[in-house]
Amino acid sequence: MDDFLSTKEMGWLLDRSAGSVRRMIRDGEIEGVRLPDGFRVPKDEALRVSRDRIESEAGRKLSDRELEGLIDEVLTTNEERA
């Protein structure tokens, strides 16, 4: 997992569009930074925001390492489809 995720990648984690993620950043729902090539979400924020959703789907609490592994899996799967 990179230090920052794009809004597209964050959308994959939250099952939302990249536009929805940008709106969430602008509305202060999630932390993000604006760069010349678009918004980015810091890794720590991506972990925080996606933890509840992923843990509810898994039906249990996950360690940070497990959570990062699942996030990497989601990102890899979606990149292969794109």
Q: What kind of feature is each model-predicted range?
A:
Residues 1-20:
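Polyanion-binding surface elements
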Residues 4-8, 29-55:
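Short helix-start
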Residues 25:
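DNA major-groove recognition helix of helix-turn-helix
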Residues 44-82:
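A short, Lys/Arg-enriched interface patch at domain edges and termini
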